[in-house]
Regions:
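Conserved acidic segment of CheY-like receiver
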Residues: 3-17, 22-26, 39, 54, ...
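Acidic catalytic/metal-coordinating carboxylates
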Residues: 37-38, 64-70
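Active-site beta3 strand of CheY-like receiver
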Residues: 49-55
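C-terminal output helix
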Residues: 89-91, 105-118, 161
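Basic, Lys/Arg-enriched C-terminal extension of HTH/homeodomain DNA-binding domains
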Residues: 177-201
Length: 201
């Protein structure tokens, strides 16, 4: 499936009744849904280029939700994750959010609140993908200059490190800021820092 098909909400839970219930709720709200019985099945079907979010049970047989979160991070995938948790798993879910998960919901959850969370997660995923597309437009030299600017280097230091003139550094810096749509070094630094894992608003 391509981005032209719209974002996809993945539901990963070993409880078939809950999976079916979530699929019905999400499809009723107009979302496209892919439901999987476990983490392994999700990994076999997940397409990183497809926009979306992941509704994930924290405790499952085989690979747990937390282990799947770690595996996705290891593979460099930044899909927003909303963990589904029982009351006793709240400390575990809080830890998952600290490690980059978007949010967690406790069972039994409010359907309307869950739909709002999913809409927020999809909006953040779309924005992250837009930012990533802007970064893709940078040349390799512009990326080098950008990384050194973000590291706090001055133009003359960047010029010396890359064996180019200060004027060339300034031209690359101007190109970076134009392509990324920022108008200050502070905004550039913030944009680069925000390119990590999606977090809740």
């Amino acid at each position: 499936m391509t981005d032209l098909d719209g974002p996809l909400v993945y539901v990963v839970d070993d409880d078939a009744a809950l999976r079916d219930s979530l699929r019905w709720l999400l499809e009723s709200a107009g979302h496209r849904v892919a439901a999987c019985a476990g983490a392994e099945a999700f990994l076999a079907t997940y397409a990183a280029e497809q926009g979306g979010c992941l509704l994930l049970d924290i405790r499952m047989p085989g690979m747990s939700g937390l282990e799947l979160q770690d595996e996705l991070k290891r593979r460099g995938h930044a899909i927003p994750i909303i963990f589904i948790t029982g009351h006793g798993d709240v400390p575990m879910a809080v830890n998952a959010v600290k490690k980059g998960a978007f949010e967690f919901v406790e069972k039994p959850f409010n359907a309307q609140a869950l739909l709002v969370l999913i809409d927020n997660a999809l909006a953040i995923d779309a924005e992250t993908r837009r930012r990533a597309a802007r970064f893709e437009r940078l040349t390799s030299r512009e990326r080098e200059v950008m990384e050194l600017i973000v590291a706090g280097k001055r133009n003359q230091d960047i010029a010396a490190e890359l064996s180019i003139t200060i004027k060339t550094v300034e031209a690359h810096r101007s190109g970076v800021m134009r392509k990324l749509g920022v108008d200050s070094i502070a905004a550039l630094v913030k944009l680069v820092q925000n390119m990590g894992a999606p977090r809740r608003k």
